[in-house]
Amino acid sequence: RPDRSHAKSARSVAETMGNYHPHGDASIYDTLVRMAQPWSMRYPLVDGQGNFGSPGNDPPAAMRYCITGDALVALPEGESVRIADIVPGARPNSDNAIDLKVLDRHGNPVLADRLFHSGEHPVYTVRTVEGLRVTGTANHPLLCLVDVAGVPTLLWKLIDEIKPGDYAVIQRSAFSVDCAGFARGKPEFAPTTYTVGVPGLVRFLEAHHRDPDAQAIADELTDGRFYYAKVASVTDAGVQPVYSLRVDTADHAFITNGFVSHNTEAPLTPLAMEMLREIDEETVDFIPNYDGRVQEPTVLPSRFPNLLANGSGGIAVGMATNIPPHN
C-alpha cells in the first residue's frame, strides 16, 4: 500500500508465488519490475525504490541479495557495526525493525529502519588488490566503475558479474586516516582525487575534451567521495547466513566494508490501489487458489481502466493484437 512503509521486493514475490503462482519467481519479479518502469507503462502501478533498470536496457537489480554477518556497516562519526550484531539473535528468514543511522553512497547519514536475515545461501568473496573484501550472495549488487563505450560510468554489478581487473567503488568516508584505508580532505591523499586515480578517465578526456558534458562526468568521478579499487579475485566462500538493510533513500544504498551496496523495494502506486478498491466488499467473486489454502479473486474490481490506459499485446489464433496506451 502506498500509505505504508515500503516492502522488500523479494517479500512481495515470495507471497505472490506462495499464494497464487507456484511456477517460479522469475516471471513474477520481471512483471513487478515492468510495472515500476515509467518507460514501460504509461501509468506505473508499482512505486519502485532502488535500481529498476533504465530505458537503455540496463538490467534491474536482483530481488534478493545479501551480505555475510561479518560485513561492517559504516555509521556516522567514523563508527561501524557488524551487520549481524545490529539485531542480536535475529532469526533466519525474518525482518526486524531497527532505528539506525548509516552512511549512504555519498557518505551522508541516512535512516535504516529494517534488518533482514535471509537465512543461509551460497556466497562469494570479492577481494581488491589493496586487500579490501566483502562477501555476499552471487546476485548482490556492488557499485563499480565501468567502461561504457569509452565513457567511465558508475554502474551496479552483481557479484557473479564482477571479474578480476574490474574496479569496485569504495566510499572514502568509510575509512579513517588513522587506519588502513582511504580518506578525503587530507593532503596526503589528494593525488587520488584527480584523473590519475580514475581508470580510463584520462583517455576519455583526451578524446572528448571539447565536449561540454565531459567536464561534468570528470567532476562527478573526481570529487573525492570515491576510490576505485581494482578487483584481484572473486572466490567461493561456501554457504553462510546473510543479511540486508532497508535504507530510507531513493537508491537504498549503504556502505559495507567500504563497498557500496543497495537493494530494491516496491509498494503499489495510488492508481494501482484503485484497481483493488473495495475488493473485500463482495464486488467480485472469489475461488480457491491452486492448493485450496486461500481464496483468490476471479477478476479485479478495476475502477481504473488499466487495459486501455497502459495498453497490452498478445497473440491468438496466429494473429497479433496490440492495444496502444491511451490518455
Curated annotation (Swiss-Prot):
Highest taxon of the lineage: Bacteria
Enzyme Commission code: 5.6.2.2
Modification comment: This protein undergoes a protein self splicing that involves a post-translational excision of the intervening region (intein) followed by peptide ligation.
Catalytic site: Y65
EC top class, as a word: isomerase
Gene Ontology molecular function: any one: ATP binding
Cited PROSITE patterns: INTEIN_C_TER, INTEIN_N_TER, TOPO_IIA
Subcellular location: Cytoplasm
Record bears the keyword Cytoplasm: yes
Keywords carried by this UniProt record: ATP-binding, Autocatalytic cleavage, Cytoplasm, DNA-binding, Isomerase, Nucleotide-binding, Protein splicing, Topoisomerase
Catalytic activity: ATP-dependent breakage, passage and rejoining of double-stranded DNA
Swiss-Prot/TrEMBL GO biological process terms: DNA topological change; intein-mediated protein splicing
Entries under CDD domains matching the protein: Hint
PANTHER family per the UniProt record, alphabetical: DNA GYRASE SUBUNIT A, CHLOROPLASTIC_MITOCHONDRIAL, DNA GYRASE/TOPOISOMERASE SUBUNIT A
Complexes and interactors: Heterotetramer, composed of two GyrA and two GyrB chains. In the heterotetramer, GyrA contains the active site tyrosine that forms a transient covalent intermediate with DNA, while GyrB binds cofactors and catalyzes ATP hydrolysis.
Function: A type II topoisomerase that negatively supercoils closed circular double-stranded (ds) DNA in an ATP-dependent manner to modulate DNA topology and maintain chromosomes in an underwound state. Negative supercoiling favors strand separation, and DNA replication, transcription, recombination and repair, all of which involve strand separation. Also able to catalyze the interconversion of other topological isomers of dsDNA rings, including catenanes and knotted rings. Type II topoisomerases break and join 2 DNA strands simultaneously in an ATP-dependent manner.
Similarity-based family: Belongs to the type II topoisomerase GyrA/ParC subunit family.
Protein name (record): DNA gyrase subunit A
Originating species: Mycobacterium xenopi
